[in-house]
């Protein structure tokens, strides 16, 4: 199949490309996929991507009435950050009579693209996005249609969009200084794959700068982990613990989800906190104070980031045409006994 490069792509084009009826494509676009076979769903997805299809009711600006619907696209719904940010978005939506359509991408650019196109088809009035770093063409299309789009936590420097985030470099440096001040000489960073995700890249860069100076022999231990692969994580932890056992060891977990996985795997391996390995991480939650000796974390203002992002959406909906803003909210280190 070849991408259509001229003219306006229609539902008929998609149907012909996918080998299905127009009504089947319409049901798919409107989220009514229960009665569509998995094979047809796959073919429709492929046709939409290859034809670069945009639902005409949005592409031509034919909205008859306001939907009062906000799209909130999160990279990982199981991450404590996503849950707290959602609560902040929800509070503002409830206050102003908006509904939320929540989409989870599992950090997949392909799934993110699919979710963005579905939100476009549902006539969302605004979008809050925890981005994968891809699909900039779709986001530009949102901007062309004057759909307010706010980035939360993750930046996309190439796009002129409002962004709500924290100063990742500064707060990462602060927590690492506290780790090293406790006498740790072998500090590792455990993270999900960094790819083009800005907070991970910023935090990892600070770690590499500091570890190259303060770790024994300038050793940089950057572990990129698939959080769904428990055996890989256990193997990485076991290896880190056994290598250079005379050194005082600590781990900085790059987000709340990987911290959860590390704590679980350490328990299974019989590794004690902090006697065997000290730990610290991001995304403070209530249960961190209840685990073992209490976990040292960075408390991100995740809830307030959600509120602030939604407030920016409302200002844009109300007609604010000002230059895009980057709003940095303050994070803080919470010291407990895990170091």
From Swiss-Prot:
What induces or represses its expression, per the UniProt entry? Induced by galacturonate and negatively regulated by itself. Is subject to catabolite repression by glucose involving the ccpA gene.
For the keyword ATP-binding, the answer is: no
Q: Which SMART domains match?
A: HTH_LACI (SM00354)
- Entry's InterPro entries? Cro/C1-type_HTH, DNA_ligase_ATP-dep_cent, HTH_LacI, LacI/GalR-like_sensor, Lambda_DNA-bd_dom_sf, Peripla_BP_I
CDD domains, sorted: HTH_LacI, PBP1_RegR_EndR_KdgR-like
Coiled-coil blocks: none
Going by the UniProt record, its keywords in alphabetical order are: DNA-binding, Repressor, Transcription, Transcription regulation
In the record, biological process GO terms are: DNA recombination; DNA repair; regulation of DNA-templated transcription
Q: Which Gene3D superfamilies match?
A: 3.40.50.2300, lambda repressor-like DNA-binding domains
Which parts of the sequence belong to the HTH lacI-type domain? Answer: 9-64
Recorded GO molecular functions are:
ATP binding; DNA ligase (ATP) activity; DNA-binding transcription factor activity; transcription cis-regulatory region binding
What S-S linkages are listed for this chain? none
DNA-binding residues: 11-30
Enumerate the PANTHER family for this protein: LACI-RELATED TRANSCRIPTIONAL REPRESSOR, RIBOSE OPERON REPRESSOR
Q: Function of this protein?
A: Transcriptional repressor of the kdgRKAT and kduID operons for pectin utilization.
* Name of this protein: HTH-type transcriptional regulator KdgR
Q: To which species is this protein native?
A: Bacillus subtilis (strain 168)
């Amino acid at each position: 199949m070849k991408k259509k490069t001229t003219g306006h792509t229609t539902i008929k084009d998609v149907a012909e490309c996918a080998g299905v009826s127009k009504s089947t494509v319409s049901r798919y676009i409107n989220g009514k996929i229960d009665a569509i076979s998995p094979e047809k769903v796959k073919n429709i997805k492929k046709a939409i991507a290859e034809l670069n299809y945009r639902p005409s009711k949005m592409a031509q600006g034919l909205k008859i009435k306001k939907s009062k619907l906000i799209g909130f696209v999160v990279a990982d719904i199981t991450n404590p950050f996503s849950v707290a940010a959602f609560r902040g978005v929800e509070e503002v939506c409830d206050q102003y009579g908006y509904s939320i359509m929540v989409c989870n991408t599992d950090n997949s650019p392909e799934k993110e693209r699919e979710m963005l196109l579905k939100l476009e088809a549902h006539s969302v009035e605004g979008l809050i996005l925890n981005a994968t770093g891809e699909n900039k063409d779709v986001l530009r299309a949102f901007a062309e249609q004057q759909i307010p789009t706010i980035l939360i936590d993750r930046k996309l420097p190439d796009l002129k969009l409002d962004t709500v985030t924290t100063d990742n470099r500064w707060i990462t440096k602060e927590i690492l200084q506290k780790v090293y001040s406790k006498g740790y000489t072998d500090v590792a960073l455990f993270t999900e794959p960094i790819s083009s995700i800005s907070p991970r890249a910023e935090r990892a860069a600070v770690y590499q700068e500091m570890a190259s100076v303060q770790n024994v022999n300038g050793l940089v231990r950057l572990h990129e982990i698939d959080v769904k692969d428990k055996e890989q994580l256990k193997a990485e932890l076991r290896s880190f613990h056994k290598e250079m056992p005379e050194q005082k060891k600590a781990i900085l977990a790059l987000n709340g989800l990987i911290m959860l996985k590390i704590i679980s795997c350490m328990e299974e391996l019989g590794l004690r906190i902090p006697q065997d390995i000290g730990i610290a991480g991001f995304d403070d939650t209530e249960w961190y104070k209840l685990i073992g000796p209490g976990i040292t974390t960075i408390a991100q203002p995740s809830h307030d980031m959600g509120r602030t992002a939604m407030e920016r959406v409302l200002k844009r909906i109300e007609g604010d045409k000002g230059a895009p803003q980057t709003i940095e909210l303050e994070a803080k280190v919470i010291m407990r006994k895990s170091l």
